[in-house]
């Protein structure tokens, strides 16, 4: 009975994704996000990931620096560091322990926290595969006011020269 229910759930899930996708006029967009939100959007519509920003997060100050020079920085080599060497070490401690997920550094010391990846090899393979799918002419740039986001960062984000920007904030 378990396999039957799993198959039924899979069929239902695919039908829901199809129904969601039917209303989309634009199905080949790139989401640049400072957290996992973009992955949820692609999953809801059953779309291929067209971004490397899946299963990871970037602290707001680094994210803003990345966006300021996206085309120049995004294709630079990802180098990995130990969690103890993160400039955000106080922020990532959980119960006084360092996280086990990989932390990559891109460009000029922009940290990428690969939260949902097992190891550096997996993180790098997924990043390199997905970064090639970015469509710079069809992007949605999203910021959430988490991970050291300030009102000043939100103002700077708003001033960036991107056509489609979205900011989720609880700040006034």
Feature map (PLM): residue ranges:
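Short intrinsically disordered, low-complexity coil segments enriched in acidic
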Residues: 1-2, 172
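Short hydrophobic helices that act as membrane-entry/anchoring signals
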Residues: 2-13
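Positively charged, amphipathic N-terminal segments that serve as targeting/anchoring signals
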Residues: 14-27, 32-156, 167
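A generic structural motif
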Residues: 164-172
């Amino acid at each position: 009975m378990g396999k039957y229910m799993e198959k039924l759930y899979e069929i239902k899930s695919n039908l829901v994704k199809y129904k969601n996708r039917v209303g989309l006029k634009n199905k080949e967009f790139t989401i640049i996000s400072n957290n996992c939100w973009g992955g949820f959007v692609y999953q809801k519509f059953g779309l291929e990931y067209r971004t490397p920003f899946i299963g990871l997060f970037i602290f707001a100050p680094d994210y803003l620096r990345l966006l300021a020079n996206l085309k120049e920085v995004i294709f630079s080599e990802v180098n990995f560091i130990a969690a103890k060497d993160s400039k955000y070490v106080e922020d990532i401690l959980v119960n006084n322990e360092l996280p086990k997920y990989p932390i990559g550094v891109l460009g000029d010391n922009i940290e990428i926290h690969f939260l949902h990846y097992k190891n550096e090899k997996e993180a790098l393979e997924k990043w390199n595969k997905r970064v090639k799918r970015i469509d710079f002419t069809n992007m949605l740039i999203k910021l959430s006011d988490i991970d050291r986001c300030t009102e000043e960062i939100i103002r700077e984000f708003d001033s960036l020269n991107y056509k489609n920007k979205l900011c989720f904030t609880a700040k006034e």
